[in-house]
Every structure is written in structure tokens, then in C-alpha cells.
Amino acid sequence: MRGCPRTGFPWLSAGAGHNRGVDEARRDRDEEGRARNARPRDGLGRPLPYGTPGVERQPEGVVRSPQETVREAQRLLDAGMPFHAHEVFEDAWKSGPDAERELWRGLAQMAVGLTHAARGNSAGGARLLRRGASAVEAFGGRDPHGIGVGPLAAWARELAGRVEAAGREAAGPGGDGGGVDAAAEAPRLRPGPREDGR
């Protein structure tokens, strides 16, 4: 068998190994026929084995008012479900006005950053928290829809620093440590007390 002239590894035939085609007949599909993984998920969005009870997934493509978006995302963040909150922000990002897309995208990135931090991925979590903070800072001073942009950006940067330091301490340079408690670290999207009194 001839190999690659650069690496010497043997050529693999089409369909070998990970390049094998997907059996479209067995692939999970949604009601519209689009590919969608039907495996249950945990509160941080991680796939669970088929048949395992999971957390109900957020419906995709829901158009909400900004107030509904903030209220639903805050509820999910407070429940320790930042992955699901990111999906709510993503709907607003995709359906909202162009002038606000970066705001919703930044909030989605912060929610995914918290998700990664809770899963123990300190490097990815810190990176996304900072990226989201930078995106929302462009809206500083305006606090669109009552969202406390300045305090949110400060929260994200502070958490990114703690997560990064904990990851280095737990696993050495560039490593990942234990995850944070997503509910305990949930940010306040709007200044003021939580609706649940905590």
C-alpha cells in the first residue's frame, strides 16, 4: 500500500475510519426533517445516553421580545442552566435587529463561557467569558432593555480570572480544573435583587 509522501502514513480508502458516511436513515431528525441529536441533555447541555432522563431542551428559533428574552435567560441562569440560557440569547441574536446583534451574541458567549467553566473547561470558559464581555461593552452607558452591561462585563472578566487561576492551580499550566457552580455564579442581567429572593 502506498503512503502519503509527506508523512508516510498509508492512504485510507474513501469511507474508511472516521470518514465513513453517515447513515441518513438512522440519523436523529426534528419535525421538519433537519438533523438534530435527540439524545437527552443534562443541565449544562452535555449529551446523556439514550433512555436516560434529561433536562427539557430549549426550543430553537423562538422569537421573543427583549424583555421575555432577558427574563427567560435569567431564569435559566439562576437554575444553573447557562447552556440553555445561551440558546435563548442565540434566538435573540438571530431574530433581533442588526443594531443589537452584538449585544445578544456577547450575552450568548458569556453564557457559554459559564457553561464551559461549570464543565471544568477553564481555558475555554475564560476565553468565552472575556470575548462576551468585550462584545457587550460596546453597549456600555446605554444599558439596553435594562441590561446592566458594565456590571455584566465586570462579572465576566472577574469570573474568567478566577476560573483560569483555578484551572492552572488544579492541573498545571494550560490544564483544566474542577468546574464552578453555575447557579451560584449566575450573573444578574439587570441590576437589582433576584426574582426568587436569593
Region spans (language model):
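Residue signature of alpha-solenoid helical repeat architecture, marking inter-repeat boundaries
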Residues: 63, 101-103
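TPR/TPR-like (Sel1-like) alpha-helical repeat modules
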Residues: 122-140
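N-terminal alpha-helical interaction modules that lie
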Residues: 9-96, 135-198
